[in-house]
Amino acid sequence: MTIQQLIAIVRDASGLMVTDGFDIEQKDGCENIVTSSDVAVQDFLCQQLSLLMPSSGFLCEEKDRNDAQLHEYTWIIDPIDGTANYSRGIDQCAICVGLKHGEEMEMGVVYLPRTDEMFYAEKGKGAFCNGKSIHVSERAFNNGVLCTALPVYHKEYTDICSRIIIDAFHQCNDIRRFGACAPELCYLAMGRCELYFEYLLSPWDYAAASLILTEAGGIISSAQGCPLCLTEPSGVIAANNAANYRQLLDIVKRHS
């Protein structure tokens, strides 16, 4: 399996993200939705990747597909990260596919069809967008932009997150909320922002993008400062350099 094969499969899958005519269903509440495009993209990806790597497992957002513990190699898939954005015609929505080997990511692809930005990385080989090498910025915390969000699916954590975000806002330059984890981590990887925080995410939200970020020179961990769990939900913090990472981690720990 090569990164170029994976890129080709992801690009083909994007053809199933129709611009109109998709069905919308609620999953766990009015905030969490799934479209018929999510299901179609995931089914296509699983079928194609199973043909190329028959012995691999899958950890996917839709249909509760999870046999990651049974396989040496596991595909971690979010068919559309930012489904709410997708359903409203907002550009920040992405197909995310990562290949996990043991406890580490080996490949990651994040594709934003509406902006035609294909982010990808292989372990130890750098990070790229549309064939061009990308790298994090060198901006300091006080000149940095923080990408973040309130916990729309876990509103019981709203007060904690608000305190963290307000504290960080007083120390950084500005804040952005794009409504999709993977695109935001890729933006960090290419220098469009410098800081990232979310209180609780699923592994398919961040797995593929986490490799792209680290290969671009960034740092990412759980909200407690531990290595990311690639099979269970986790809080996530990330930054463009060690000093900014430590400052953001201190803010998160102070309010958690």
Located regions from the model:
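Oxyanion/phosphate-interacting regions
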Residues: 1-8, 163-169, 186-256
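N-terminal subdomain of lithium-sensitive/metallo-dependent phosphomonoesterases centered on the IMPase/IPPase/PAP
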Residues: 1-80
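Residue-level signal for inorganic ion chemistry
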Residues: 17, 38, 49, 83, ...
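Conserved beta-strand termini and adjacent loop/short-helix elements that scaffold enzyme active sites
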Residues: 27, 61, 178-180, 223
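Active-site-adjacent structural elements in enzyme catalytic cores
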Residues: 51, 66-135, 211-214
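Residue-level detector of anion-binding/catalytic polar loops
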Residues: 55-57, 174, 194, 219
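Short, Asp-centered acidic motifs that coordinate Mg2+ and/or phosphate
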Residues: 57, 107, 145, 194-195
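Acidic beta-strand-loop-alpha-helix segment within the catalytic core
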Residues: 98-185, 233-256
